[in-house]
Amino acid sequence: MPLLDSFAVDHTRMQAPAVRVAKTMNTPHGDTITVFDLRFCVPNKEVMPEKGIHTLEHLFAGFMRDHLNGNGVEIIDISPMGCRTGFYMSLIGTPDEQRVADAWKAAMADVLKVQDQNQIPELNVYQCGTWQMHSLNEAQEIARHILDCDIRVNNNTELALPKEKLQELHI
C-alpha cells in the first residue's frame, strides 16, 4: 500500500491549532486543488469530543464557505479526521495559510453566535447519519479554544519524517 501524505509527517512535532498545506494537485483542466490540514488539537495529547466535532462539522462547513469562498477559492469539502484532532479541507484554489487562518477564526466566532441546537444545519434524521449525536456546547468549547489561541502554520518540510525513521517503521 502506498504511503499517504498525511502519514509522512511527524505527528509528535505538530503544533495546534495550526494550518498546514497537506497536498496540492492539478486537475486535467489545470485547476489547482489544495488540501489543508486544519489541526485543532495536538496529536496524541488532545482530542475533540465526538458530539462536539460532529456538531462542528455541520456548522464549520457553511461558515468556512462564508469566509473563504471567492477570489479564486471554492471549498469542495471539509471533513473531520478520524483521529478527532482536526479537519481536512479540500478546495479549488491556492489561498495562503494566513487567509485560511483568518477564515477559520471568523468561522469559530460564528459558531459562538449559534444560540440553540435547533439552529444547527441538517440536524434531522433525513440529512444526518447520527442526528442525535450532537452537542452545541461542546462545539462552542472547541471554537472558544481556537479563538483563545494563535493559529500557527505547520510546515511539511519541518515535519517530514526522515527516510531512516520511515524505514525503521517498515514503511
Swiss-Prot record:
Keywords in alphabetical order: Autoinducer synthesis, Iron, Lyase, Metal-binding, Quorum sensing
Among the Pfam families in the record, one is LuxS
| Signal peptide residue numbers | none
As recorded in UniProt, its EC number(s) are 4.4.1.21
- Residues bound to Fe cation are 54, 58, 128
What this protein is reported to do is described as: Involved in the synthesis of autoinducer 2 (AI-2) which is secreted by bacteria and is used to communicate both the cell density and the metabolic potential of the environment. The regulation of gene expression in response to changes in cell density is called quorum sensing. Catalyzes the transformation of S-ribosylhomocysteine (RHC) to homocysteine (HC) and 4,5-dihydroxy-2,3-pentadione (DPD).
Any idea what this protein is called?
S-ribosylhomocysteine lyase
